[in-house]
């Protein structure tokens, strides 16, 4: 489904500010795998997501989706393969447009169809059906401006827009971090439901170690541009935060007393 072969990325190469963001990353995700990704600031998590999505082109290495070479395919051409939800609820939506217009824009972009000024009754009914799954009452507010929605509502809409056409890969970039606990719990539940419903291959970056343990069936720990720990299945299910800290300590040779020290 998704393969990264010897992917490396360096920023400001040859200058005093040189930063090796990714170092020889080799990964393979199978169809339907749900992978959580943890690591401190500067570990390479966001760069990894940007390389997969096409925002960045790696200096070295290759990216494959469904066995197709996409390393040099720009972001807008990967939209048919990839859905993405960002940390900022406003990043995945157009706040000055209505819910209906946002959904229509996402549908047209991913389906490679021209965006029409009018929306047919059939498509409105389809949008309402999808919005019903959120249980937020948004199906009755199609003409509401997205900028007037709460952060949780906007993020739920972003999640829906990223997944309702069943992309090959779903990228979640700390998509609950900016929400209050109640809304974060809601988006987490919706994420689990939609990933399971569509059997989506998912990569989710989080700074919450417990969330990384609770969600998904595989976990990556990143540090200094490398995946230093990869665990899945029953071994992941048995992991605790203390166990993760111990794994980080073994690989870094540094002792940490809390997850904040690792993720900060």
Task: Locate each region found by the language model.
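Helix-to-loop junction immediately C-terminal to a conserved catalytic motif
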Residues: 53
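A short, flexible loop at the N-terminus of ABC-type nucleotide-binding domains that lies
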Residues: 1, 10-24, 74
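H-loop/switch region of ABC-family ATPase nucleotide-binding domains
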Residues: 206-207
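ABC ATPase C-loop
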Residues: 162-163
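The feature captures the beta-strand-to-loop junction immediately N-terminal to the Walker
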Residues: 38-40
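Conserved beta-strand-loop-alpha-helix hinge in the C-terminal portion
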Residues: 226-252
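ABC ATPase NBD coupling module
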Residues: 69-83, 91, 113-116, 120, ...
